[in-house]
């Protein structure tokens, strides 16, 4: 949904965002989503993602390359959805630092079940919903290039200057979440000074 989020971004950034978004839900000028109910749900998710980061982030986002925008949207997802952040830290980074360097549906699903054991809200989800969340997360990893079709992990590929942006906004953890090696992170930090 990166294209849809980018399409409504000017509405979200506007001083009159609420009225413009309500109009979009009704008139479907930008999203081209068939049903009003689905548009309403999509707009609610876009608002959640928009609010997960400072407004200045979005101004910079509009000037990024398409590749950098894809990675930026991954960052936003990790900020907006705690469960995705937990999957990244507790499954993906751990697997990246292990011998196997691969992640399967079952690896993430096991983490989902551990989260559900401690979180009544997640525990209340149906098994189908839990599986859908895991599947969506894995799809995101594939779209940003962290996971390939054979479930092997790969670091995010971006120029150092694009990664340095996350340092300037006080989010250095994202470099590790992007599976960069410590020496790469140090090089980016040094170049950002």
Language model feature labels by segment:
Residues 1-72:
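Eukaryotic partner-binding/assembly regions in large regulatory complexes
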Residues 2-16, 77-78, 82, 172-193:
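Leucine-rich, amphipathic alpha-helical/linker segments
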Residues 21-22, 99-124:
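Short acidic, hydrophobic short linear motifs in intrinsically disordered regions
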Residues 33-36, 113-133:
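Short, positively charged loop/turn segments that connect secondary-structure elements
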Residues 71-101:
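Positively charged, polyanion-binding regions of nucleic-acid-associated proteins
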Residues 91, 115-119, 144:
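A short secondary-structure junction motif
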Residues 127-132, 136-193:
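Accessory, usually C-terminal, subdomains that scaffold auxiliary metal cofactors
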